[in-house]
Amino acid sequence: MHRLALLLAFVATASSAQSPAEVLVVGNRSSAVSEQIARYYVQRRSVPQRNLCWLEVTPEETIARNVYEEKIAAPIAAFLKAQGLVDRILYIVTTLGVPLRIAGSYWGRDTDAAAVDSELTLLYEIIHGNKPPLRGPSRNPFFMRRDEPFRRPRFPMYLVTRLAGYDFADVKAMIDRSMAAVNRGKFVLDLNSSADRTGNDWLRTAALLLPKDRVVIDETTGVVCGQREVIGYASWGSNDPNRKGRFLGLGWLPGALVTEFVSSNGRTFVRPPDSWNITTWKDTANFFAGSPQSLTADYLHEGATGASGHVYEPYLAFTPRPDYLFPAYLSGRTLAESYYLSIPALSWQNIVVGDPLCRLKKDRGT
């Protein structure tokens, strides 16, 4: 009964259809792949041309705070105002080739380092004259609001996602899969017996809130590999000491979402050598892009349609909650709504990769 009641709470608010006219697409003139992705998405999703905002900024993944303010935030804000889109836009979509993360001067929970996309969620507030604190995470007002549609003026923020992968082919395939997402398949939840109890409890709660016949939950010391017809996957990623391989051989359905409790999985979208593999923090000689940990982009390359990641240390408390993410998505919420319902903080280290409008359609085969 508890499972049904919570699913119905999600379903009751999932019918508020959001449209391509509410999406702002951000491309970078300094990046050929960014231009290619932006144009393809606008065409594929029928986003109005007036909703395409061009930046001229370095395509480097890591930038200084002043570059973000002057070359990204200010031009986007000016564009929204000039086009009369400040309140019309609900979603902002960045692209591969738009800078990924802002370097910081402080570390720990008081850092001013952040993901570019997470900073952009606050642009609505900034345009309206508010000045959020620069250091540390800001509260996400949409977090856990499963009984409310994302709307103005209730939620003064933008839902920001990124169309990124290792190359244009990966991103194009991801966009195409988002258009074919269907409500079928299984949710794979892989616990880590040696990890923090909190994350494991979130995974157990997710299992209770999803249809029992569609859940694969593993509480053993093994690592789930080779599952087919996967529509949702959550685990500890490379933080599970029993995981030795970079790829898990999962068979992804169109629309499949991924989330992991991993500190640096969104650190880069540069493709590692095929010979590279996840390793330990002691094995510094074999780090890739400054870390030994699993990569968000690997899941997208393998066939997932959406994934979360972290550009710097987020701390477990600020990672996406699978017990909110998957029930929301299953109920008919968009990809962007589902992820942001599950993320506690803004102006932080989180990224969401995928088409914000991706939504599970009814499976006509059932």
Predicted regions and their residues:
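Sec-dependent signal peptide recognition
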Residues: 1-7
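N-terminal signal peptide c-region/cleavage motif recognized by signal peptidases
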Residues: 11-14
